[in-house]
């Protein structure tokens, strides 16, 4: 990691070691408080590789380190309620999903109007494909739908969205519902070869949650990050 940052990003070695030493000792508040400087550079490269298949969009992502993916979800729901969504506003939840995404919107402090769309497509042999129908995806065209929550790959089936579904959602955002906020939880994306997140396909509208715990087998460490492109819908709204 030390050599990588020096060789790939021309990091000042003294500043880098100083940041790491202070992080381990914990004698100061982190600066910047959302994520440390060199940590952000390193994680940006990692997300570009794993979430964008080494083909990231132009520009950089602003990152916010959190105490695991569940904490990231809590911060996001609170921020959405405080700044973007009111009680009764419509959101779409693509299921199966990580359980808190189902339970949190039901709390009295949020009371969002939740529309669930289910991955219930079958093949000709009656086998479950864990994919979504075009008719259900087209419900996102309504401007009454303010936010889309998706776990990709899904949890627990661990199926990625099909390329056709990804393309259909991107088209809907661009042509029908340009103010749709997409919150995508891509914790299992690192298990899928050549994975492309919504943060790669439509970064302007996307807020991404990624946790390191599953891929690195370190659930108890509670390490995750929220990623938002520097040019984004949320700042506009």
What are these regions (language model features)?
Residues 7-176, 189-203, 207:
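Conserved core of the PLP fold type I
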Residues 12-13, 204-237:
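Conserved core segment of the aminotransferase class I/II
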Residues 182-183:
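Residue-level marker for buried hydrophobic side chains located in beta-strands
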Residues 186:
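Walker B catalytic acidic pair
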């Amino acid at each position: 990691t030390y050599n990588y940052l020096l060789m790939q990003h021309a990091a000042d070695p003294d500043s880098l070691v100083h940041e790491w030493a202070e992080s381990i000792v914990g004698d100061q508040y982190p600066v910047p408080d959302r994520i440390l400087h060199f940590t952000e550079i390193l994680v940006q490269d990692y997300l570009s590789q794993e979430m964008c298949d080494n083909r990231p969009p132009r520009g950089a992502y602003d990152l916010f380190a959190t105490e695991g993916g569940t904490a990231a979800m809590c911060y996001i729901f609170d921020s959405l309620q405080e700044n973007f969504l009111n009680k009764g506003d419509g959101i779409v939840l693509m299921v199966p999903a990580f359980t808190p995404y189902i339970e949190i919107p039901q709390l009295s402090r949020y009371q969002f109007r939740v529309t669930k769309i289910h991955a219930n497509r079958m093949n000709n042999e009656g086998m479950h494909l864990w994919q979504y129908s075009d008719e259900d995806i087209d419900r996102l065209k309504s401007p009454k739908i303010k936010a889309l929550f998706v776990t990709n790959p899904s949890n627990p089936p661990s199926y990625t969205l099909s390329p056709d579904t990804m393309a259909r959602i991107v088209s809907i955002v661009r042509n029908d519902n340009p103010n749709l906020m997409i919150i995508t939880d891509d914790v299992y994306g690192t298990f899928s070869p050549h994975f492309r997140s919504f943060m790669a396909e439509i970064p302007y509208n996307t807020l991404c949650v990624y946790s390191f715990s599953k891929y690195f087998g370190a659930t108890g460490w509670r390490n995750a990050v929220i990623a938002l492109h520097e040019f984004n819908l949320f700042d506009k709204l």
